[in-house]
């Protein structure tokens, strides 16, 4: 049997020899792995499909949403292949189930006066009926999708103005569409209020700025943005179908929920807000609606194990704190709740079920925290813990605890990293060579490229795909132009992608295979680390911190300058000092020894940094005033580098020339 599997496993390699860039079919080992999943999980439980359809008011026959410039912001037609329910051997059956559930889009009634539009973006948008208008919780990613959701609600439920916008937390898929619902003038006049958890603006901006370019490039892997939709491509994103495309917007909150939370009455509707900082977002809050006995758990309890560490990159989240906040919600609200819903996936009804889900999600994050550290305290390292830790059956067999978004594997490593860091304690790993420097030596020790490939192909034929990608990665980094190595690496990554239950893992594996076969798509549009709204909302100190990240240390070597910067429209002064190839900024300080003093409104500084206007034009218009050496600010800006979005990931990074 094992020999037959090996021969069948080699068939995709041989069949694909004529067209090496095309996706390969699932191997016999992958098919066998999918059958094991079907046997191990409770697929007879179809209750989630009833939940995901419950309360449906309207499901548009064709969902295609365009941005104002005519580009496609969102469409679901590419996922029609899922609708026949036929098992696909190139998709993990558990992930395929989640992918089909996330296709349940449209306008739904959750409870009396509470409605959700689901499937118009990665997240859900919630409309709560007030005395005179709508209270909206979360605004999707981009104005086009938010506007389309609001138009659907208006058609089906009647036209009503929006009185309040609530941001549940500080991630872009929950605030980026706000300008599709309300105008800045409505907020400025007080006609619309915006409510958010304490720390919202700092969290919304800071998390995505300083390392924003790297995060967004890595997000192309996690979300599979380069992949075609299909059985051998992108099928889902666990908490939704994928990312909407279009500009982000951001309007600052007019009221923050402070402390542990607050009780408010909004347009006649009573709300209780529970702040949960440091859970799924640095600033996040659950919402209790006592009139309907409805509990909105933000993104703290959704239809999957969530990320303690997200593959795009971010600070590691606090598993223990997350567990404790769920426990608080359970005891404050959960034992009264008759409906529980969230900003992703579908609701749940009935108190007994709600209590059980809250308990098991609480214990899911608590178990990951405690048992990871239990192993760590026995000497298990960050390179081992993901192969040791397993969930108990009472958690593992619940669909909402499965690892579609987070995974036990990468979450366990995240917990260990949060407490002990990346170093495993073994001095052999304390000061490693860079992969591109060690790769050639590994290949030499293994007998050269041909011998390595010969053995790797044999491992591939045995279905040892994890081992193949570990070994062949060395050869790809030693010889990035070795076509045979790239093809074998892509084939092995692809099989891992087909087998992955986790949507981010699948997308990452398949994106890596795509780039190994086709190269990095440098001609594709790039994602921006910040929009004009984001820049305007950014604290000035953070703005200058970001300029420090952009500083080209080589260009700044040996240079020293100091600039007094005055921002009269916001009443702030900063001292900028460049020394030792580092840019310092200090608020509220001016130096008599500064080489230049510049006065410019913060709004005009934003325009200058966005390259909407030149410094010469601002001087001519009297909007930039300077004394001392007039060249220093220009010299400083001339040392700022721009980041290449499409940097290499699965091959050695190109050497910088500067």
Curated annotation (Swiss-Prot):
Q: Which keywords appear in this protein's UniProt record, sorted alphabetically?
A: Hydrolase, Metal-binding, Periplasm, Signal, Virulence, Zinc
Q: What class of enzyme is it?
A: hydrolase
| Sequence positions that bind Zn(2+) 1 | 169, 171, 280, 299
Query: Where does it mainly reside?
Result: periplasm
* CC cofactor note: Binds 2 Zn(2+) ions per subunit.
User: SMART domains from the xrefs?
Assistant: Lactamase_B
Q: InterPro entries of this UniProt entry? A: Alkyl/aryl-sulf_dimr_sf, Alkyl_sulf_C, Alkyl_sulf_dimr, Bact_Alkyl/Aryl-Sulfatase, Bds1/SdsA1_MBL-fold, Metallo-B-lactamas, RibonucZ/Hydroxyglut_hydro, SCP2_sterol-bd_dom_sf
Q: What EC number(s) has UniProt assigned to this enzyme?
A: 3.1.6.21
Q: Which reaction does it catalyse?
A: a primary linear alkyl sulfate ester + H2O = a primary alcohol + sulfate + H(+)
The record's comment about this protein's domains reads: Contains three distinct domains: an N-terminal catalytic domain that contains a binuclear Zn(2+) cluster, a central dimerization domain that ensures resistance to high concentrations of SDS and a C-terminal domain that provides a hydrophobic groove, presumably to recruit long aliphatic substrates. Although separated by the dimerization domain in terms of sequence, the N-terminal and C-terminal domains are spatially directly adjacent.
- Function, in words: Alkylsulfatase that cleaves both short and medium-length alkylsulfates, including the widely used detergent sodium dodecyl sulfate (SDS). Acts in vitro on primary alkylsulfates such as decyl sulfate, octyl sulfate and hexyl sulfate, but not on sulfated sugars and arylsulfates. The hydrolysis of SDS allows the bacterium to use SDS as a sole carbon or sulfur source. In addition, contributes to the in vivo virulence of P.aeruginosa by playing a central role in the degradation of mucin, a glycoprotein that is the primary component of the mucus overlaying the host epithelial tissues.
Subunit relationships: Homodimer.
- Write the protein's name: Linear primary-alkylsulfatase
* Source organism: Pseudomonas aeruginosa (strain ATCC 15692 / DSM 22644 / CIP 104116 / JCM 14847 / LMG 12228 / 1C / PRS 101 / PAO1)
Gene coding for it: sdsA1
């Amino acid at each position: 049997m094992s020999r037959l599997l090996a021969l069948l496993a080699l068939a995709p390699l041989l069949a694909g020899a004529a067209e090496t860039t095309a996706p390969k079919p699932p191997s016999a080992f992958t098919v066998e792995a999918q059958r094991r999943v079907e046997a191990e999980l409770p697929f007879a439980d179809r209750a989630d499909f009833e939940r995901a359809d419950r309360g449906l008011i309207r499901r548009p026959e064709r969902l295609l949403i365009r941005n104002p410039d005519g580009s496609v912001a969102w469409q679901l037609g590419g996922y029609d292949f899922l609708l026949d329910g036929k098992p696909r051997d190139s998709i993990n059956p558990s992930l395929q189930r989640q992918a089909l559930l996330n296709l349940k889009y449209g306008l739904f009634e959750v409870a009396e006066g509470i409605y959700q539009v689901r499937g118009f973006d990665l997240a859900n948008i919630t409309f709560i009926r007030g005395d005179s208008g709508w209270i909206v919780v979360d605004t999707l990613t981009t104005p086009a999708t938010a506007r389309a959701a609001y138009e659907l609600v208006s058609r089906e439920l009647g036209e009503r103005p929006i009185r309040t916008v609530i941001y549940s937390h500080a991630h872009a898929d929950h605030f980026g569409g706000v300008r599709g619902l309300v105008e800045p003038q409505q907020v400025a006049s007080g006609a619309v209020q915006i409510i958010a958890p304490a720390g919202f603006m700092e969290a919304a901006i800071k998390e995505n700025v300083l390392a924003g370019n790297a995060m967004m490039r890595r997000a192309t892997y996690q979300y599979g943005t380069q992949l075609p939709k299909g059985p051998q491509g992108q099928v889902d994103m666990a908490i939704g179908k994928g990312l909407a495309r279009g500009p982000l917007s951001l309007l600052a909150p007019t009221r923050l929920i402070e402390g542990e939370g607050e009780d408010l009455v909004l347009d006649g509707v009573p709300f209780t807000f529970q702040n949960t900082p440091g859970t799924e977002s640095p600033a996040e809050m659950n919402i209790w609606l006592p009139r309907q006995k409805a509990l909105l758990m933000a993104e703290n309890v959704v239809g999957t194990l969530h990320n303690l560490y997200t593959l795009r990159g971010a600070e590691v989240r606090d598993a223990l704190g997350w567990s404790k906040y769920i426990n608080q919600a359970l005891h404050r609200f959960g034992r009264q709740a008759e409906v529980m819903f969230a900003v992703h996936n579908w609701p749940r009804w009935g108190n007994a079920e709600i209590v059980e889900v809250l308990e098991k999600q609480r214990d899911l994050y608590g178990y990951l925290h405690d048992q990871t550290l239990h192993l760590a305290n026995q000497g298990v390292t960050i390179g081992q813990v993901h192969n040791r830790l397993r969930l108990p059956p009472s958690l593992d067999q619940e669909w909402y605890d499965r690892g579609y978004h987070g995974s036990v594997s990468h979450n366990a490593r995240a917990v260990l990293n949060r407490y002990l860091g990346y170093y495993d304690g073994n001095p052999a790993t304390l000061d490693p060579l860079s992969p591109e420097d060690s790769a050639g030596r590994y290949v030499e020790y293994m007998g050269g490229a041909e011998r390595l490939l010969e053995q790797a192909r044999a491992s591939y034929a045995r279905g040892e795909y994890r081992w193949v990608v570990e070994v062949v990665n060395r050869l790809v980094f030693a010889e990035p132009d070795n076509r045979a190595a790239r093809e074998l690496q892509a084939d092995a990554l692809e099989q891992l992608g087909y087998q992955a239950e986790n949507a981010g893992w699948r997308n990452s594996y398949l994106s890596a295979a795509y780039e190994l076969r086709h190269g990095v798509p440098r001609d594709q549009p790039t994602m921006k680390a910040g929009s004009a709204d984001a820049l305007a909302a950014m604290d000035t100190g953070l703005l200058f911190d970001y300029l420090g990240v952009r500083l080209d240390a080589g260009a700044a070597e040996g240079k020293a300058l100091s600039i007094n910067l005055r921002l009269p429209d916001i009443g702030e002064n900063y001292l900028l000092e460049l020394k030792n190839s580092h840019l310092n900024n200090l608020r509220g300080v001016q130096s008599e020894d500064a080489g230049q003093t510049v006065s410019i409104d913060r709004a005009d500084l934003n325009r200058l940094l966005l390259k909407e206007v030149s410094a010469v034009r601002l001087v001519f218009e009297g909007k930039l005033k300077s004394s001392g050496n007039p060249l220093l600010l220009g010299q400083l800006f001339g040392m700022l580098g721009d980041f290449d979005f499409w940097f290499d990931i699965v091959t050695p990074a190109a050497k910088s020339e500067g």
